[in-house]
């Protein structure tokens, strides 16, 4: 081990996603195998016992890279000196609750967490919001963190990206590692737009290998609604796959993608007609610790419609929480 210790915060630490996520972090899957880590676990008071039990198991796993664990119900403690934060904990939608109610309820979680990050985190802080509705929760946290650059707040759409890659690999009977330039535009919701326009497998255009009706009638809705499908089959929401995708996102953000495209939900700079500031899924590459939107792509009317639908959806979400954006 040659590098200084990195502090990594995880909220919702007693939950199912965190239970998979924390072991990957402790194993060195975010910063690498030469970087020791400290884990800072945040939970609500009612679930602090669960988080303490998770910490006990982490200690028992004797990870060489894991140097310390803090368990707390105070955001200012969890985010003290934090270099990377996974904001996983969020309020699930209750029976009969509208999406606007859910947005407001989560705003009361992510606003204070954004402020606590602003006041306590390290200068190189990177924040990935996993808790849903992730794009708008990230927007709320970002607005509350006035001194942190906006591009340090991302929402997780890597799960959607990975789901799309897996479905294409299965359909084509080809190695998923050969798939390039696939992207999911927009919101982490059932309205997202998985796009194969530029995607290739082993250098071949995927759009020429699959039927258009399959693409629009099966692939797009299956990727967009995969979470609901898993709940139907498993009886619980996606947890391990969400954790794995969160690791993928943060690892690539920090370490780069070697020019390969990844889907990342980041603050828009106005590219492709997406209003500046919306946290939106784009085709990106990571270089020097920053996501950069792939530029100068030609868009068909079909693509423009898919992007526009997501812009409308995210603008409506932003309007619903405008009082929380300060």
From Swiss-Prot:
CDD domains: MDH_chloroplast-like. The keyword NAD applies. GO terms for molecular function: L-malate dehydrogenase (NAD+) activity. The active site is at 188 (proton acceptor). Disulfide bonds: none annotated. NAD(+) binds at residues 12-18, 106, 113, 130-132. Pfam families: Ldh_1_C (PF02866), Ldh_1_N (PF00056). GO terms for biological process: malate metabolic process; tricarboxylic acid cycle. SUPFAM superfamilies: LDH C-terminal domain-like, NAD(P)-binding Rossmann-fold domains. Its EC number is 1.1.1.37. It catalyses: (S)-malate + NAD(+) = oxaloacetate + NADH + H(+). InterPro entries: L-lactate/malate_DH, Lactate/malate_DH_C, Lactate/malate_DH_N, Lactate_DH/Glyco_Ohase_4_C, Malate_DH_type2, NAD(P)-bd_dom_sf. Substrate binds at residues 93, 99, 132, 163. It is an enzyme of class 1 (oxidoreductase). Keywords: NAD, Oxidoreductase, Tricarboxylic acid cycle. Belongs to the LDH/MDH superfamily. MDH type 2 family. Catalyzes the reversible oxidation of malate to oxaloacetate. NCBIfam families: MalateDH-SF1 (TIGR01759), PRK05442.1 (NF003916). This is Malate dehydrogenase. It comes from Corynebacterium diphtheriae (strain ATCC 700971 / NCTC 13129 / Biotype gravis).
């Amino acid at each position: 081990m040659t590098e200084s210790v990195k502090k990594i915060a995880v909220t919702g630490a007693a939950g199912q996603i965190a239970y998979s996520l924390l072991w990957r972090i402790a194993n060195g899957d975010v910063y690498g195998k030469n970087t020791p880590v400290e884990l800072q676990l945040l939970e609500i008071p009612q679930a602090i016992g669960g988080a303490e039990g998770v910490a006990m198991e982490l200690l028992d796993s004797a990870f060489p890279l894991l140097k310390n664990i803090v368990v707390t119900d105070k955001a200012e403690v969890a985010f003290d000196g934090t270099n990377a934060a996974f904001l996983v904990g969020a309020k699930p939608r209750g029976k009969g609750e509208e999406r606007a109610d859910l947005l407001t309820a989560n705003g009361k979680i992510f606003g204070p967490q954004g402020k606590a990050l602003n006041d306590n985190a390290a200068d190189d802080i990177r924040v990935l919001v996993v808790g849903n509705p992730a794009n708008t929760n990230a927007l709320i946290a970002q607005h509350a963190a006035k001194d942190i650059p906006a591009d340090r707040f991302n929402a997780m759409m890597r799960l959607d990206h990975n789901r799309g890659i897996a479905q294409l690999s299965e359909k084509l009977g080809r190695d998923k590692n050969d798939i390039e330039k696939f992207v999911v535009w927009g919101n982490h919701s059932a309205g997202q737009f998985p796009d194969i326009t530029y995607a290739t497998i082993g250098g071949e255009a995927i759009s020429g290998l699959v039927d258009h009706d399959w693409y629009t009638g099966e692939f797009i809705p299956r990727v967009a609604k995969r979470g609901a499908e898993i709940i139907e089959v498993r009886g619980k929401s996606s947890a391990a796959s969400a954790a794995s995708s969160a690791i993928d996102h943060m690892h690539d953000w920090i370490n780069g993608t070697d020019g390969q495209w990844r889907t990342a939900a980041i603050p828009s700079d106005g590219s492709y007609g997406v209003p500046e500031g919306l946290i939106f899924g784009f085709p990106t590459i990571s270089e020097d610790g920053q996501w950069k939107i792939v530029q100068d792509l030609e868009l068909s009317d079909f693509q423009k419609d898919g992007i526009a639908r997501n812009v409308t959806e995210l603008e409506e979400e932003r309007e619903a929480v405008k009082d929380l954006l300060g």
